[in-house]
Amino acid sequence: MSDQNLGQGSDEPEREEPIVRDKRRIDPETGKVREPQDLSHEELVDVGPAGESQGEEILSDDDLDLLSGQTTADQLAADQLAADQLAAERLADLQRVTAEYANYRKRTESNREIERERAIGDAVKGLIPVLDDLERADTHGDLIEGSAFATIAAKLRASVERLGLLPYGEKGEPFDPQIHEAIFQQPTPGVTADTVADVVETGYRLGSTTVRVAKVVVAVPA
């Protein structure tokens, strides 16, 4: 009985260990494509579900994942480059618009100041003859300190100065044809350059604008 059992046990075929072959074309550790190796016909040809051989090698899921990951990284790099270029263009546009706006503000403020000075100049031009009369009265001693007339004159002068109207032209200063009008030239010994010898009519400035030039007598070298 025992011999029969032994005989039956010896007739069973020995079980073969399964052979595992890594057919992935891309090395999962390095990410590089593997070089083709010399394989037997059985290893080169895969049998399809219906038993028919397929000449094309099918990529495994791991290979597809690696390829997909590489494609995604390349796409992300391309998208990032495009985003950086777009950001640089938008920044350049913003800088250009900012510069244009700054220049516009400067022009506007400059024009506004010019118009302001022009408007004030038109208003105070009518007061300049009054200021001339006050100056003559002061020269002749008619503005007695403490009198009502002197008080009014002081207030008027202070008001026009607050508006920015300032007198100019003094005896002894260099003659400048841009701001002085020479009504007479007087040869003077010892004078080496044209100099204001006397101020006949005071000049007035409003900011950078000359409202009226000063009329002067010029001392010239003899």
UniProtKB/Swiss-Prot annotation:
One GO CC term on file: cytoplasm
Gene Ontology BP annotations: protein folding
Positions of region (Disordered): 1-64
CDD domains attached to this UniProt entry: GrpE (cd00446)
Location, primary (coarse class): cytoplasm
Compartmental location: Cytoplasm
Domain of life: Bacteria
Subunit structure: Homodimer.
Cited PANTHER family: GRPE PROTEIN (PTHR21237), GRPE PROTEIN HOMOLOG, MITOCHONDRIAL (PTHR21237:SF23)
Assigned protein family: Belongs to the GrpE family.
Function, as annotated: Participates actively in the response to hyperosmotic and heat shock by preventing the aggregation of stress-denatured proteins, in association with DnaK and GrpE. It is the nucleotide exchange factor for DnaK and may function as a thermosensor. Unfolded proteins bind initially to DnaJ; upon interaction with the DnaJ-bound protein, DnaK hydrolyzes its bound ATP, resulting in the formation of a stable complex. GrpE releases ADP from DnaK; ATP binding to DnaK triggers the release of the substrate protein, thus completing the reaction cycle.
Listed name of the protein: Protein GrpE
Source organism per UniProt: Leifsonia xyli subsp. xyli (strain CTCB07)
Gene that encodes the chain: grpE
